[in-house]
């Protein structure tokens, strides 16, 4: 499993609704991709210009192949990237002691 957290900050207030709409359109495309286990976008109540993407992929290779898909090529790159700053964090889920280590 390959887990990814992406933290997005929208640069200009008028772009917040545009980014939210684009992210909502990406979801179905991402979920239809080979190896996408789950893909969720969240918007902060406290700071509406902040979004968090939580992605779970079957493998890093599946996530890397995702870059060539329609969600990235037709929505993320042209509609979202020009309006944001982002942090990309490949991540490991912290499990409780009885579940065993993940690292």
Predicted feature locations:
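Active-site-flanking beta-strand signature of metal-NTP-handling nucleotidyl enzymes
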Residues: 2-9
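Short, glycine- and small/hydrophobic-rich beta-strand elements in well-ordered beta-sheets
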Residues: 24-52
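Hydrophobic pocket/interface hotspot
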Residues: 6, 19, 39, 53, ...
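Localized chelating/binding microdomains
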Residues: 10, 53, 86
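Short, surface-exposed ligand-recognition loops at beta-strand->loop->(often short) alpha-helix junctions
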Residues: 9-19
